[in-house]
Amino acid sequence: MTETLRVAVIGAGRMGADHIQRLHQRIHGAEVAAVVDVDLARAQAAIEGIPGAVALADAEEALNNGDVNAVLIATPGFLHEDILLKAIAKDIPILCEKPLTPDAESSLKIVEAEVALGRKRIQVGFMRRFDAEYAALGSIIRNQELGELLMLHHQHRNPTTPAGFTNEMLINDSVVHEFDAIRFFTGEEITSVQVRLGKVTKNAPAGQHDPQHVLIETESGVLADVEIYVNAKFGYEVATQASFEDGIVSIGGDKGPYTRSAGRWGGNVTPGFEERFGAAYDVEIQSWVDAALRGEIGGPSAWDGYATAACCEAGVEAQKNGEKVAVKLAAKPDLYS
């Protein structure tokens, strides 16, 4: 049995660079063997101080490197399909940042390739499942501590968006996390999505309709809604309230320390996702490494990546027509049952 994962990190941008340092500094049982980026200078900068790691400009070269026995994909989503298919052919553990691929059709191809391999090798990077509060709420739901889950209310607020952040990206890059969270909490597939477009903030860039209200339904009839507001200015806030037969649970709300000074009271708002979910990323990657060393995955599967891609497609269609749009899914293979 492999005792150490020797990981090729493909993509050395914001997310990839963060994972490189995470693997090098905080994760046990893994080491960075290679870093790949089309900007070779960026890859070289990323491996500085990491003994034995090599910088490469080509993903296939990394996968063919005999010192590599696992891969972490942190490139833009449109590059994922080709890298995933090549990594599946190598039969090595794969951690793929979301999205699995940018659309349901190509995501299904990845699922089919993994089914043909005969075992699960892909873990998809939906880090919220590893957040302590998300895990606690998930446990309350599964154990029916407050009876049946009836409704979920989500708020997803970002301080601002980068240039070129389109309406579709509100669904594909932001609400995608809520789609996965709803599937995680309920243990069910999402059956329909509707998007309502109301009053627009003055802070939205030209061509972007912000905020939006997303209405979601699951197989058993659990209703969920998402306020997606990506130019909220005040900071980064992701919160959920779950309504049960016998109570309500809220997560992701305000946290201390709270101060009282000069006639005022208050606390701090997290500025971004790294601060809010940094610990969850650590738990996620450690779970992947531990599971990979056992020949398993330790989190969301390729099927989860495909299912959320299908939800996103329904969401983008619903943005455009304002109607309730059914989520179209292929039959679930036994591998993921």
Swiss-Prot record:
The keyword Transmembrane does not apply. Involved in the oxidation of myo-inositol (MI) to 2-keto-myo-inositol (2KMI or 2-inosose). It comes from Pseudarthrobacter chlorophenolicus (strain ATCC 700700 / DSM 12829 / CIP 107037 / JCM 12360 / KCTC 9906 / NCIMB 13794 / A6). Homotetramer. Transmembrane segments: none annotated. This is Inositol 2-dehydrogenase. GO terms for molecular function: inositol 2-dehydrogenase (NAD+) activity; nucleotide binding. Keywords: NAD, Oxidoreductase. HAMAP family: IolG. Coiled coil: none annotated. InterPro entries: Gfo-Idh-MocA_inositol_DH, Gfo/Idh/MocA-like_OxRdtase_C, Gfo/Idh/MocA-like_OxRdtase_N, MI/DCI_dehydrogenase, NAD(P)-bd_dom_sf. Its EC number is 1.1.1.18. Belongs to the Gfo/Idh/MocA family. GO terms for biological process: inositol catabolic process. It catalyses: myo-inositol + NAD(+) = scyllo-inosose + NADH + H(+). The keyword Oxidoreductase applies. It comes from the Bacteria.
